[in-house]
């Protein structure tokens, strides 16, 4: 199971880095040729993307290590730390872009080579669709926080690239303020996205409980065992790919210690099967 998880997250990271590298090359060309502020915003976003993805790729290698004497609960929280790093990079790029865009609002420039910007934006949308498709499959198989954060960001990038395309087209037809206005919008999107990722990462670092729906599934599965009379003291958290669950089973007084131990093992197996993922109970 661990090998499967490692395969999926590394495949996602490699595909993402290849696609983003192609987009960076194309956007750099288009920005240098056109001088578009919104294209610069899109380029800045892609540069932050590849930095964050590379960082996630390195951190995931550490997060996938098995538990050791110094980290008895494993290294899964390294993913959440990577998420905080992503949030910081994205917030920084958003602030820089906002300053540049506001300056361009007061000093609008007529864009050149607009057609190149249009084709590069279409190319970027196609590359982003490939990334989102791969990441959706990976998240479905692994529930990786780092890949999930990336996926949310790239879904937003589809809108971002479409907005850049529209801004360049409007500027081509003489609406000079369209480019910096859209660039300010991109900056706002980056800042909002960084907050969302930071909040999700903080939840995992602070051991936030699993969703109520998942906790209810734990209760339902546990109570479905014929020898379980009740369940209390359920505590949960997530660390990387592993769901940590603690609970107390209420059993009949006449059960032997050996039978009670077997019931606990059987309930643990039932919960693990229910979630079809790595569970520590």
Language-model-detected regions and their locations in the chain:
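Alpha-helical transmembrane segments and adjacent TM-loop junctions that form the membrane-embedded core
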Residues: 1-16, 26, 32-281
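Histidine-centered catalytic/metal-binding microenvironments
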Residues: 20
């Amino acid at each position: 199971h661990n090998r499967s998880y490692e395969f999926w997250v590394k495949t996602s990271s490699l595909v993402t880095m290849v696609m983003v590298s192609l987009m960076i090359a194309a956007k750099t060309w288009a920005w240098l040729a056109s001088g578009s502020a919104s294209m610069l915003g899109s380029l800045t976003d892609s540069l932050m993307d590849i930095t964050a993805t590379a960082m996630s790729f390195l951190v995931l290698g550490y997060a996938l290590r098995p538990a050791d004497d110094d980290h008895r609960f494993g290294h899964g929280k390294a993913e959440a730390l990577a998420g905080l790093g992503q949030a910081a990079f994205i917030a920084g790029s958003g602030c820089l872009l906002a300053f540049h865009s506001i300056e361009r609002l007061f000093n609008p420039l007529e864009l050149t080579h607009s057609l190149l910007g249009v084709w590069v934006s279409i190319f970027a949308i196609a590359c982003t669709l490939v990334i989102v498709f791969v990441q959706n499959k990976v998240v479905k198989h692994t529930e990786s926080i780092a890949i999930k954060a990336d996926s949310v960001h790239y879904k937003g990038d589809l809108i971002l690239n479409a907005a850049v395309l529209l801004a360049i087209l409007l500027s081509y037809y003489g609406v000079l303020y369209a480019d910096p206005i859209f660039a300010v919008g991109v900056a706002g999107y980056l800042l909002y996205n960084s907050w969302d990722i930071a909040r999700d990462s903080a939840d995992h670092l602070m051991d936030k409980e699993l969703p109520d729906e998942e906790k209810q599934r734990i209760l339902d599965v546990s109570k479905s065992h014929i020898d379980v009379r009740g369940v209390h003291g359920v505590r949960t958290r997530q660390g990387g790919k592993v769901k940590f669950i603690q609970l107390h089973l209420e059993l009949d007084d006449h059960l032997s210690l050996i039978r009670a131990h077997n019931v606990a093992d059987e309930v643990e197996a039932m919960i693990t099967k229910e979630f079809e993922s790595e569970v520590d109970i």
